[in-house]
């Protein structure tokens, strides 16, 4: 493993951007990334990840001029795009290759253990990029040239997450189940800020506050289904804690006698 890590790293990429501004009212920007990674096998090394963003400066419109004494700024914006991630194997390089280990032993014939090599990681030549599809919708609002309000709602879906496929049953005979691009999760939330600035005499007064709400949900993670649905992590937040929920303490012998059997 150490000798593999000492090999030179190689990544290639091509990026482009095109922006357009019409009369400081309408804005559009397009981006793309065309990236190649050594971490994947031939045929899966290159990924194309586009993005586009648009904006409308409403307060710069002629029809809006009668309102500018009150609404000094109004801008609407939206964006959607994809981002690729090739660093999905941790510190392991060439994650599409299988590995063997000279460990373990098996019993044959006269019950003597015979050592040998075993499959440590199953090869997966189809492993590829993890892809994140991001959306963002926001606004910028200014009032009386003193108060600035900004808000952004975002939604992010990460697909092809590299996880172990624990749905493979033990009778298949694998000592280690393969890593595959089957994980998926989504996250969403809102970021907001409020800023006030004014000048009182020779003193500049500024105040700022922020607000953030974030949530997420596991959509698919390769785990085998549990006996009870509430034990499954799919549909829950990432790093969700599981455990028994206490309902209280016994306050009398009668409550103990009427209660179900308790587990120690």
Please provide the spans of the model-predicted regions.
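Aromatic-residue-lined binding/catalytic grooves and analogous aromatic/hydrophobic interfacial grooves
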Residues: 252
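Extracellular/periplasmic, surface-exposed regions of secreted and cell-surface proteins
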Residues: 1-245
